[in-house]
Amino acid sequence: MPAVRILILAACCCWLLLLPVRCCGPGRGPVGGRRRYMRRLVPLLYKQFVPNVPEKTLGASGKSEGKIRRGSERFIKLVPNYNPDIIFKDEENTGADRLMTERCKDRVNALAISVMNMWPGLKLRVTEGWDEDGHHAHDSLHYEGRALDITTSDRDRNKYGMLARLAVEAGFDWVYYESKAHIHVSVNTDNSLGVRSGGCFPGTAMVMMETGKKKPLSELKLGDTVFTTDETGLLIHSVVLLFLHRDPYKTATFVLIEAEGHPTKLLVTPNHLLFIKSSSSTGFQPTFAYRVQIGDLIQIYVNGTQVQSSKVVRVSVDEQTGVYAPMTEHGTLLVDGVLTSCYATVESHTLAHASLAPLRLFQGIASMLPDLHTSDGVHWYCHILYVLAKYVLWWDMP
């Protein structure tokens, strides 16, 4: 039997390698490979920051861990960036501006490609990177190699709003149109759980059962039938197949979303997918929760047989213990009365749903692997998908 299991898993892994390629075609390589979807890029406004939370919260770049001093144990974890497509100002002539964390290096290299694609002939310019001279506030992320100040090589300030938007798309954890002279960007720590975690809801979040009663996610079980919607917005039943992530003891930061005329607040982790209609989109699109802005539309259930649109009136952050990510057979569900995707990390509901097809089609495989589908933590299958996407297919994952 162990040999049979290994063969089955190997066959599934081979299929998984083909799924994303078949759906999206070839990528651009290890850097800048984030899949782009058909939506208009809207420049940031002066003094706007994304996500709409303070920089040093867990929903953005996280807390400061203290200054990194040259020669210290933490200093050796900073890596130099010699990307020829980036101009480093380096006014100190020490090479300090080239030093940054691995995550920061990945993001800025991705941004450099986007800049050249957006404005042929121009390059990204870094005016400030790691700071060892004490020129910033005492808890600045510049002291940790996690923050950069950037411009375009032509220093055209009319481009800075779009440069900030490109930085958001490149995966920086916090982007701020801070000054007329530059854009400020920063990232979370390389070892942060917030960087590697997917998307979930708190255990107190409620789903509506087929009986009409509500049940908290902490009590939801495999095989339960909950409400979701079809393509037209009509309510339908959907069976809970498994938990993509379940950890009752993990503390996480959630995006808190309040909608007009909806009594319940939705709490969801930043990289979870919601169906959002913004001013720049023609319909409801799968969107990371951290991108939600006041004025965007979400789909809520109040009563009757279908969902309705409601305007987002407040976005904030909250920290709670317990994370749950159930997956239904339809890939969607109503959580606290809001229509949500079951998926996270990849900003394509269709692709995520297709990639998890083997779990829906071959439940017998999971039954041959005792406890793997019921244990706490990230589901083993999702972990395989993440590793394949990030390290084999070279996808740019958050």
Swiss-Prot record:
Q: Where is the lipid attached (Cholesterol glycine ester)?
A: 199
Enzyme category, top tier: hydrolase
Q: Where is this site: Involved in auto-cleavage?
A: 269
State one molecular function term (GO): cholesterol-protein transferase activity
Q: Which residues bind Zn(2+)?
A: 142, 149, 184
User: For this protein, what is the EC number?
Assistant: 3.1.-.-
* Ligand binding (Ca(2+) 2): 92, 128, 131, 133
Residues that hold Ca(2+) 1 according to the record: 91-92, 97, 127-128
Has keyword Membrane?
yes
Record SMART domains: HintC, HintN
Site Essential for auto-cleavage — annotated at 272
Site Cleavage: which residues? 199-200
For whether the record's keyword set contains Hydrolase, the answer is: yes
Q: Name one GO cellular component term.
A: endoplasmic reticulum membrane
Q: Which family does it belong to?
A: Belongs to the hedgehog family.
Assembly? Interacts with BOC and CDON. Interacts with HHIP.
Q: What is this protein called?
A: Desert hedgehog protein B
> Which organism's genome codes for this protein?
Xenopus laevis (African clawed frog)
